Amino acid sequence: MLSSANSINVGRLVPQVVYYFAAYAQLLRAGAIEAGDAVEFCVPTGNFGDILAGYYAKRMGLPVAKLVVASDKNNVLADFLTTGVYDRNRPFFTTISPSMDILISSNLERMLYFLSDGDCELVAGLMEQLAQTGRYEVPAELLATIQSVFGCGWASEDEVRAAIKSCWDANGYVIDPHTACGYHVFEQVAPAVGAKARVLLSTASPYKFPRACCEALGLNVPEDDFEAMRVLEQATNTVAPAQLAELESKPVRFEDVCDVDEMASYVESAAKRMSTN
């Protein structure tokens, strides 16, 4: 079966709805909220997938006060949610939060569909503008509707590193660079009106990005990722997930690299190989 691995695949996106209900249930058990209280969620995102799952949770009835988008230096989403103009015609930055290094957020189309009350003609027109010119602007009324549901903010590289250090110093909790974008944004954005609690979604293990975390914490930064994991373990008295640590001794399974113009022929040849196995 050929399938997309990222959140444009609704099969990966829909299960993420569970995060929001699970977080709400934890707050209830902790006595932090009462049933029916509204909660604000801050979500580090690039492809608008995880936070769209939060919007689905809201539509399912979860009391959500606001969904706050946290971007990295590639802040096309933050700009869009502020101005109503989506413009991918800008520099692309390679950051220490690579999963958010995106200039075209695939799932935004799904959000536009829902918040425009299913106006397929409008959404199709916007997507055509994006394909042809790299930008589009939503009507003012639609922007107001979007802003009533979504807040936003972004963090520079230095702010991401500072957030990792700040969270460790304040809480003894190590966060990865993506989560650090959200940590910074939550500190900068005022709580949503009516929110009884605020939740930051921690989106990845810091051990997936051990060198960036070591650097942010002022530790020795080995060139080797696995050595950096060990430095991080010793300094923070935490343990790397076994699934990551064991990769050091695992054989490399996939070594093929192909250019974009070779993709179609590669997929065809791979499919033929699979069909004979």
Map each language-model feature to its residues.
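PLP-dependent amino-acid enzyme catalytic core
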Residues: M1-N277
